[in-house]
Amino acid sequence: MAALFDVKDVTFDYDGIPALRGLSLEVGAGEGIALVGANGSGKSTLLRLLDALCFPSNGTISFCGQRLTPGLFERNGFAFSFRRSVALVFQNPDVQLFNSTVFDEVAFGPLQLRWAREQVTAKVEQTLELMGIAHLRDRAPYRLSGGEKKRVALASVVVLEPDVLLLDEPTSTLDPRSQSQLIDLIQGWKGASAKTVLTATHQLELLEDIADKVVVLEEGRVAASGTPAEILSNHELLLRANLVHAHKHKHGTLTHSHPHFHSHSHGEHEH
């Protein structure tokens, strides 16, 4: 599998505070990768770097063999091609919703990429139906619920049919039905559509549904990578990375412990 992204020894600082520390990672075309880690482990920062919204303090990130630099994006041809191929959905949908209606929000990206107006209208209508938000087409995004905003943000990316989807906590704020629909979409993207999908998530119970490979981040570094089954069975790793906690039970004079998943979006524990 050819390397689509090649991340080499990347460091990134926020005002002198390190967010990533010597992180290296290869992403193959068509891979479905889940990024997991506690808050502050570097998941969102890595996705922003892969989307070239910022650039490494040290180290390099290459896309299709070209090193991503500010200068490269000053070339309109490359910037246009990259933005057509790679798309990021932020954890907080308010960051990317700014148009007056849901329809205009989903149409914004295709229009910026100079699609024909007739093509834009047809594709937006199709995407609104796909994401279950056709009834919201004339609503103002800022008046929507958190889950509705998340679906609009996803639609604004899905409509572009990018080759690479970078999803930051995409299931947060979604109701169970919408979450299930999104998982089906992710499976389709990384299956028949052969898209590359990187998903940052806290929800370990979703890993086997959304990823072929799991990368565990800890303090801005790659702590481990493997299949979902390999990562989920490594309780010592999950405890150290603060993805589960040990829960003790006492039965008479006997005490035993077992791990609980941190299910942040539902506020529940899972065994």
Tell what function each PLM region has:
Residues L165-D168:
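Catalytic Walker B motif of ABC-type/P-loop ATPase nucleotide-binding domains
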